[in-house]
Amino acid sequence: MEQQPKINRIQWLFGNVCNYDCSYCPKHLHSNSAKFDDGDLIANAVQYTVSSLRMLDREPSFEFVGGEPTLNPGLLSICQRMGNQRLTNKLTTNGSASMEWWEEYYIYFTEVEISYHTEFADIEHIEKVINFLIEKKLTVTIMVHCTHIDQQWNKAIHVYQIFKNKEY
């Protein structure tokens, strides 16, 4: 029996560019001060990392985070340079990207973690994204963020119950 390669997990923080301004999130995590690096530069680094690890019989597994990674204009280039076989990549996102975005990019990920932020998230859109990703056989994890503000707390509990009832 052939031995499976060892997995190296790599968390890639793109910056702090985000389309949300959540009250509970520290400003330095979404201030848009750390802009996205050049997509080709990162794509080259990703390609080098993939090649180097595979020469060591190791398989890379990337997790893309940072602000809101779906806003990174270089993400497609980065994903396309990961190698010719599907990697076990994870995307941590607020889920706000358009359905067109998801239709183009989902193939580069095996897992998507959606942070549901009650102050900004559109539940109907998030449900469409979740259903689409599940239909495409991706693992989907949902984090519903709560705050000390009563209105947001109640909304978070309500959204959690909706997601739980739908067995997400």
Give the label of every model feature segment.
Residues M1-Q4, S52-R54:
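Short boundary motifs at domain starts and secondary-structure transition points
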Residues D38-I42, L71, D122:
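Phosphate/oxyanion-binding active-site loops and adjacent basic polyanion-contact surfaces
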Residues G66-G67:
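Active-site beta-strand/loop signature of hydrolases that rely on acidic residues for catalysis
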Residues Q47-E63, N72-V159:
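Radical SAM/AdoMet-radical enzyme domain recognition
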Residues Q161-E167:
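Basic phosphate/pyrophosphate-binding loop/patch that engages nucleotide-derived ligands
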Residues E104, E167-Y168:
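Generic alpha-helical hydrophobic packing signal
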Residues E2-N44:
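Canonical Radical SAM [4Fe-4S] cluster-binding loop centered on the CxxxCxxC motif
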Residues Y20, N84-Q85, N165:
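Short, well-ordered coil loops that connect the C-terminus of an alpha-helix to the N-terminus
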